[in-house]
Design a protein with these regions (language model features):
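Accessory alpha-helical DNA-binding modules that contact the DNA backbone or grooves
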Residues: 4-172
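Charged catalytic and DNA/RNA-contacting regions of genome-maintenance
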Residues: 1
Length: 173
């Protein structure tokens, strides 16, 4: 953009019609829950993790992603479709899908259902660190998940971890 074009563009904007103050949204536009901001963080977010459709679907998308459980054939469009049909309400529902559930959906079929179920079956063998990452726990990325998994090699050991044990892990707490 040339200097003249920029000057013309900015001089034609009438500031008189601009609202004097931006009104930041206070509620989630999807579910209506009051937005919150954690101390020390800049972002406001919806805390309704189990009732806000975009959050539920986003968690599922993260869970099935390549670096997490690597479930092929279950991308955002398919998650949207299965969520809208009531077949996916949470991550656990992925492991309850049947050949019939998938095959009867528009744009899917027997072959898609077979491939998706095979990929879901393979996902049951991913390393514990990837499962931990796939859960989408705030502030637990791939590296932190690996560190936690090294310290607590099973979910049984992790569930009994004390706060002191967890915070003694580098990058945790």
């Amino acid at each position: 953009i040339g200097k003249e074009s920029l000057e013309n563009a900015t001089s034609s904007y009438n500031l008189e019609f601009r609202d004097s103050e931006y009104k930041f949204p206070t509620h989630c536009p999807e579910c209506g829950t009051t937005l919150v901001r954690e101390e020390g963080e800049a972002a406001w977010r919806c805390p309704n993790e189990s009732g806000c459709a975009p959050q539920i679907k986003g968690k599922m998308e993260h869970f099935v992603s390549r670096k997490a459980m690597n479930i092929e054939g279950l991308g955002s469009e398919t998650i949207d479709l299965l969520y809208s049909q009531g077949l996916l309400k949470n991550i656990a529902d992925i492991y309850s899908l049947t050949q019939e559930d998938i095959a009867r959906q528009e744009r899917l079929g027997e072959k898609s259902a077979h491939n998706m179920l095979a990929s879901i079956e393979v996902s049951k063998q991913v390393p514990w660190a990837r499962v931990l990452f796939a859960l989408g726990i705030r502030m637990v990325g791939e590296t932190t998940a690996r560190k936690i998994a090294r310290r607590f090699p099973s979910i049984d050991q992790l569930q009994w971890a004390t706060m002191e044990q967890l915070t003694s892990i580098e990058d945790v707490g």
